[in-house]
């Protein structure tokens, strides 16, 4: 995975998912067969299905095959160049090429096309959380303004606060999601440590 903590899918599995899984499994073992399977999958009206085309592109991206991912990105662009998923995919490819500035421009573009597209906010924040924590926090607060219950935003915010030694804010933000499936063991440890460093020793021991 390029990014951890992306949104968990709550929607039913699409009928073409098995085909994408087949492509994924063949990319490393038999690239030619993977390409044939992708071609078969993207025949006819399927090549206009943005979700499907971006899923195939992402299979190649996750395998580190950026040129192939870009080939399917072009197909996705032809299907709908204003779909936020297409901008996010292009941003992820730029991020994989270590071009963080370009990646974040593309995540911003996705938000311009659809201001409710949560993944774009999260990926922008993930890209900038080391290079520019203040920009990451600003983007996550924008997401919280439109989706107050977004636990993934809380998780990212907590990580940025923790990494920048704002342990009081980190502890308060960890508390919002620590009892949910979004929290990992690492989050629980950091929550306990943030409480400890914020001199909330009793609570820190209870969490740990």
Regions found by a protein language model. Give the residues of each.
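Conserved structural position within tetratricopeptide repeats
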Residues: 42-44, 74-78, 108-112, 141-145, ...
